[in-house]
Amino acid sequence: MVVNAQAVDNRAGTLAAGGTITAKASNALNNDGGLVEAGGHLDMQADSLSNAGGRLRALGSGGESRFAIGTALNNDGGVLEVASAALTFDTPALSNRGGVVRHLGSAGLNLDMDLLGQAGGEFITNSAVSLSAEEWVNNSLLQAASILSLIHI
């Protein structure tokens, strides 16, 4: 399923597809209290994405689920659950207070360490996680099923 729009409003709604869901919004993508579920992976591109109290799910185990968000991704109280091999966040701001990011894949959770530390909530992955930064203040729970390394540069 491909959705191209200026804005996408799925508040308390449902978007579901047996394969990949690609959503491109030049403005906001709002899934507050809603459900977006792909049988494949998720490719979400928007200026902002709000999933407060919502659920974003990618059930397929192959490929990469990607969240390329221009300004901010809000997953406060939400669940972002991805079985895709890789999960990548490309956003300058991430809020996950009371939220859960669960990655079941094994090819990597890609997230800027500064975003992870300040986001809050839980980040759980079956993948290895390697983090590097000059300084890190952690307000999140991070659980990795594989080797977890923290490198001070």
Which residue ranges define each predicted feature?
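Short "repeat-start/strand-capping" segments in structured domains, especially the N-termini
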Residues: 1, 16-21, 36-42, 59-64, ...
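Extended, compositionally biased low-complexity polar/Lys-Gly-rich tracts
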Residues: 1-2, 67-71
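Hydrophobic lipid-interacting interfaces of membrane-associated proteins
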Residues: 6-8, 26-28, 47-51, 70-72, ...
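Short, T/G/N/S-enriched strand-turn elements that build extracellular solenoid repeat scaffolds
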Residues: 11-16, 31-37, 52-59, 76-81, ...
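GD-rich hexapeptide-repeat beta-solenoids
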Residues: 27, 42, 48, 65-66, ...
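Conserved small/polar residues in nucleotide/adenosyl-binding loops
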Residues: 151-153
